[in-house]
Regions:
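An alpha-helical, amphipathic repeat domain used for nucleic-acid recognition
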Residues: 1-163
Length: 163
């Protein structure tokens, strides 16, 4: 191992010490510091061997973060792509995410606050949910359930039985 490869590995290890990142993000940072491609490849290979660099685990962490903050699958998928996670890894993780119905209903409760018939508020809430990465199908279903007291009661009863 030459000096530049060792320096690249040391720098990469320092980058990964405080926070996780994807292989692409690490490669971009090392390239920005003008490390040679050979040194970058060596650092990535070695850190992957040691388990310090794991795109699958990083993707799961990012997905959990965004789901916990009320974002939908489309937003999670977009964020994984932005961070350099491969299509294959993203496709493994996305189906395992928790169902989003409670997040959609919570957002509707916060936005509509009991004004079930106000079309302007419903459109505003639907647009906000779409921007958060929920599909129109999920949004329309949630609005139907939220605005119909009988459906809402059935949904709450079913949710209580699941817990």
């Amino acid at each position: 191992m030459n000096e530049q490869s060792k320096a690249g590995l040391d720098y990469a290890a320092r980058l990964l010490a405080p926070r996780a990142m994807s292989e692409k993000m690490l490669r971009d940072k090392l390239t920005a510091k003008n490390f040679p491609q050979e040194g970058i490849d060596h650092a990535v290979e070695r850190l992957t061997e040691l388990g310090a660099l794991n795109d699958g685990e990083y993707a799961r962490m990012v997905a959990r973060y965004y789901v916990d903050r009320g974002f939908g699958r489309q937003k999670v998928d977009q964020e994984l792509r932005r961070r350099g996670i491969s299509q294959e890894i993203a496709q493994e993780i996305l189906p395992g995410l928790a169902p989003c119905s409670r997040q959609v209903v919570a957002y509707l409760e916060k936005t509509i606050r009991g004004h079930y018939t106000d079309k302007r508020l419903l459109r505003k809430a639907a647009a906000g949910l779409y921007r958060r990465g929920f599909s129109w199908e999920q949004i329309n279903t949630a609005i139907d359930v939220y605005c119909d007291p009988q459906l809402r009661e059935e949904q709450e009863t079913a949710a209580d039985r699941e817990e």
